[in-house]
């Protein structure tokens, strides 16, 4: 049938951890612990969506971070430095990820509605398997249980922005065509992942990394501040090529209906 058969969802900032704070805070701590180098939360957010080793590598290439590194060590960050930061990052992330495992508002109801329509729920993450093995059961205790998940270090081909984690979901879920899949993510590399896999893509402008606020902060934010942050996030997601941008996963059902209408007219991603 020419309709959406599966959605492939990111984790932090998409289904759990409103604002995607678990990884950003840990990057700051890992740089400090490994080399006593300070980075800001805003800097930590810039490469979000990549695998975590690649994320650290990208942070080291940010001009401001590279300048700090050069001032301290007289050289740019090396692969050995990245390994050391990653070694500090992993135990911190494994220990703390369960504290950020609660589903974002609207996720459980949206998943139930999608499943009622016969849509399968795939997922993938920039987290490595050691972190996902803690996060997945913790999220399940809160009621979020996707049909499949893939970690960034599971596949020899690699992670985002390549298509491989998304395509592994297609295989595992037995989906007949990538055009019948929707990739949902709050960061640009995840949108690129979906596009590279030949899927429809939906960006989330409020619940995730680009908006960058806690749930409590979002609830008390002025309409003006929300609008500015939303526009900033949406522009980045559209620039990455997202077919649609909505606030959070709670808005996905309407998008699915719109995509189904386009598929019925013969359109493809």
Swiss-Prot record:
Swiss-Prot/TrEMBL cofactor(s): Mg(2+)
EC number(s) from the headed UniProt entry: 3.11.1.1
GO biological process: DNA repair; organic phosphonate catabolic process
Entries under Pfam families matching the protein: Hydrolase
Cofactor note (record): Binds 1 Mg(2+) ion per subunit.
GO cellular component assignments: cytosol
UniProt superkingdom: Bacteria
Molecular function via GO: magnesium ion binding; phosphoglycolate phosphatase activity; phosphonoacetaldehyde hydrolase activity
Keyword field contains Metal-binding: yes
Record: active site: 10 (nucleophile), 52 (schiff-base intermediate with substrate)
Alphabetically ordered keywords of this record: Hydrolase, Magnesium, Metal-binding, Schiff base
Family: Belongs to the HAD-like hydrolase superfamily. PhnX family.
Protein name: Phosphonoacetaldehyde hydrolase
Annotated gene: phnX
């Amino acid at each position: 049938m020419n309709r959406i058969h599966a959605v492939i969802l990111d984790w932090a900032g998409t289904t759990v951890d409103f604002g995607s704070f678990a990884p950003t805070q840990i990057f700051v701590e890992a740089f400090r612990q490994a080399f006593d180098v300070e980075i800001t939360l805003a800097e930590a957010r810039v490469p979000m969506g990549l695998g975590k080793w690649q994320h650290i590598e990208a942070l080291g290439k940010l001009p401001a971070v590279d300048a700090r590194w050069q001032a301290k060590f007289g050289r740019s960050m090396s692969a050995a430095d990245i390994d050391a930061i990653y070694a500090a990052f992993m135990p911190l992330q494994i220990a703390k990820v369960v504290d950020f495992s609660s589903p974002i508002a609207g996720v459980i109801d949206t998943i139930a509605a999608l499943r009622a329509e016969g849509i399968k729920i795939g997922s993938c993450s920039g987290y490595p398997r050691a972190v996902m093995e803690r996060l997945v059961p913790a999220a399940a205790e809160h009621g979020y249980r996707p049909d499949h998940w893939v970690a960034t270090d599971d596949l020899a081909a690699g992670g985002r922005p390549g298509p491989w984690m998304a395509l592994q979901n297609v295989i595992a879920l037995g989906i007949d065509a990538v055009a019948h899949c929707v990739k949902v993510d709050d960061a640009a590399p995840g949108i690129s992942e979906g596009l590279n896999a030949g899927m429809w893509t939906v960006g989330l402008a409020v619940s995730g990394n680009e908006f960058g606020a806690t749930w409590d902060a979002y609830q008390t934010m002025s309409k003006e501040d929300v609008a500015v942050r939303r526009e900033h996030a949406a522009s980045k997601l559209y620039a990455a090529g997202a077919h649609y941008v909505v606030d959070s996963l709670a808005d996905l059902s309407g998008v699915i209906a719109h995509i189904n209408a386009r598929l019925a007219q013969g359109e493809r991603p």
